[in-house]
Amino acid sequence: MPVVDPEVEQLQKQQQSISFRYSNPVLMRFMQTLDVNRAVTLYREISDMVDRRHMKPTSYAERVEKSLGNLAAAAENSDFQRANSLRLSAAGIETFQQAIVGVSRQANVRSRSDAEQVMSQSMSVARQYLGLPSEVVAMEFIFGTTDTLDKYSAFVPDDVRQGPSASAVEDSVVGIGVEVKPTEGGILVERVLPNGPAHEAGLEAGDVIVNIDGRTLSGMSFSQAVDMIGGPSGSRLSLGLKRSSGPAFAVSMIRRRVDIQSVSEVRMLDSTNSVGYVRLDKFAEKSSAEMDAALWKLHNAGMKSLVFDLRGNPGGLLTTAIELSDKFLPQGVIVSTRGRLAQDNMSESAKRSRTWKVPLVVLVDENSASASEIFAAAIQENQRGVIVGRKSYGKGTVQTHFPLQSVSGALRLTTAKFYSPNDREMAGAGVTPDVVVDDFKLESRQLNSGDKDIQAALRLASRPELAQMAERSAKPQTPGYSISDGRF
């Protein structure tokens, strides 16, 4: 097996990160609004917020070292050069990089003031050798700061074209109502939201977008293509598409605000045994109300047991994870969190007087993360139900969004870790299913006879042990009571 040089791999990741930044249309539009004074003010605000609120803030020496390294690497990055209209020779790049090395060697950084002095020196060097605007250097010091933190912490600018950036947990978005991912030859439509412009225009999951407003996607990055699909409410969008079942076709639609349902599917899986099914795509603000409606719909249809599908669910709001867990747990700890500050430490327990006693199977996979893991661990460790599938992602940290004063945007920082009801640290560990279903990936959102997770869940859903768990969870727990581990 070939061995990858760790240093080479790290340099590749660094270049990929720089390319991602400078091919991101939202970030580029934001940077066009900056001057050096606003950029430096933003650096100070972000630095102070990291110092005060990040769970494990890095030193200014680490941040400066990362910033200078990124700046030197950026000089030879084609996306960076293109975004900043730079025409550089190999000799010019090398001279600049040597000058940055000189700045680094002379740096003695212990404070934000020291870091700002190094940033000022770097601005002079970049202006002299590259003709680079000083605000770009300041932004690289901001990115250098967040790059030294955990992978979930980041600066999130608002899109100056549309206003506050859409959050993954928001219940509506302006656009055409599709979820997409890159694919060979275009952009794959993974999901079409009900009642959105794309749904009304006849788009289907599996369609491939091959041109946008008459422009081919060849040579265009995924983020650039997605940016073109987005746009203000009331604006028109034309798409060229391919569908496996027929010839290429074109559609035109008007962008507007589209509601996003976090509960994406509610149905009876097995009418004979009255096994209900709910799929939750994220833990959003309205998920609790949507879940109530789904449960009552299934209850009125005669549901006797429930399969709750969290596969592919990346998480969302901590408060929503607690609310949903509380619907099924009559007692017991749900989750606890611990951070640097007292305000980041808490423990939440079940407190509802009326809960659903329906026997419960929860599906998870390697892409179930964060709030999904909180819910699954609460159900598992309180012996309320059975977890089926594959080991979850293991995110285990809490992020807080801090609105910024100097610019329109936010700073997302990791402020705490969360722990399971048994006080088990979830970061890096995740949830191991009670029943493991090996070597299976759900390729489509549509359930079918080949879904091994569903097959395993159906075999469990009507077992008397599951009903007993639902009943016993309301009483003092019996040590060691659980359904035996199994493999399917």
Where do the PLM segments sit?
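Cleft-lining beta-strand/loop regions that shape enzyme active-site pockets
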Residues: 55, 60, 128-134, 155-160, ...
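Acidic, polar loop-rich interaction surfaces within structured domains
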Residues: 369, 384-387, 393-433, 437-439
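Short loop/turn microsegments at loop-to-beta-strand junctions
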Residues: 176, 188-189, 413-415
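Conserved functional hotspot residues or short segments at active or partner-binding sites
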Residues: 93, 410, 424-488
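Stable alpha-helical structural segments in soluble proteins, enriched in small hydrophobic residues
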Residues: 67, 144, 148, 198-201, ...
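Residue-level signature of catalytic and energy-coupling elements of molecular machines
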Residues: 46, 141, 178, 239, ...
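Short, surface-exposed glycine/acidic/tryptophan-bearing loops
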Residues: 78-94, 163-166, 337-346
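Terminal targeting/pro-maturation regions of precursor/exported proteins
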Residues: 1-153, 480-487
